[in-house]
């Protein structure tokens, strides 16, 4: 059996210089995301979302990025889920994209706020019927006696709404407005390149290199 201590690889694919990155972190993110798409990575929009509850307990899970612009990074979920409860108590959160095949990570920190209802409505309407009904059927993060309970709830809402379920009031979008974005490129000998963008009080971005 392979020992965990022996599992390692050397990163050789690319390099990252502060003189080569875009002056704006969103443009730099878009550039790297485009490369991830061109490389046909599986679910390049999958990201770890880390939150902290009112009790100080952190939690993390994978969610999907569904929008990105100068205002931030958008995802959708149940407002009553653990992440929703955490964000209500503490809107500070972090995102992590890990693209193994490109030997890259992107880490984002910032403040999360709900998107406008119209944006949540539009995205909800674009989802497959099963996903729209699932948003009603799932009391996300709550204990449940068995899968049959969830499936029965889904059937009940399917009978109630047919093919036109409205958006549940407990479901919608969040946007993380970044204050810090770090781009990590694996390099040989664990001397990785880490270029970070730090937002100053005036809203401008300062580019810094971090020690690996």
Swiss-Prot record:
Keyword Flavoprotein: yes
Keywords: Flavoprotein, FMN, Oxidoreductase, Pyridoxine biosynthesis
Binding-site residues for FMN, renumbered to this chain: 61-66, 76-77, 82-83, 105, 140-141, 184, 194
The keyword Flavoprotein is assigned to this record: yes
Pathway assignment: Cofactor metabolism; pyridoxal 5'-phosphate salvage; pyridoxal 5'-phosphate from pyridoxamine 5'-phosphate: step 1/1; Cofactor metabolism; pyridoxal 5'-phosphate salvage; pyridoxal 5'-phosphate from pyridoxine 5'-phosphate: step 1/1
EC number: 1.4.3.5
Signal peptide annotation: none
Cofactor(s) in the UniProt record: FMN
Gene Ontology MF term list: FMN binding; pyridoxamine phosphate oxidase activity
One of the GO BP terms on file: pyridoxine biosynthetic process
Amino-acid positions noted as binding substrate in the UniProt annotation, renumbered to this chain: 8-11, 66, 123, 127, 131, 190-192
Cofactor: how and how many bound: Binds 1 FMN per subunit.
UniProt-listed InterPro entries: Pyridox_Oxase (IPR000659), Pyridox_Oxase_CS (IPR019740), Pyridox_Oxase_N (IPR011576), Pyridoxamine_oxidase_dimer_C (IPR019576), Split_barrel_FMN-bd (IPR012349)
One Pfam family from the record: PNPOx_N
Protein's job: Catalyzes the oxidation of either pyridoxine 5'-phosphate (PNP) or pyridoxamine 5'-phosphate (PMP) into pyridoxal 5'-phosphate (PLP).
Similarity section: Belongs to the pyridoxamine 5'-phosphate oxidase family.
Subunit text: Homodimer.
Identification of the protein by name: Pyridoxine/pyridoxamine 5'-phosphate oxidase
Organism (species): Cupriavidus metallidurans (strain ATCC 43123 / DSM 2839 / NBRC 102507 / CH34)
Lineage of source species: Bacteria, Pseudomonadati, Pseudomonadota, Betaproteobacteria, Burkholderiales
Protein's gene: pdxH
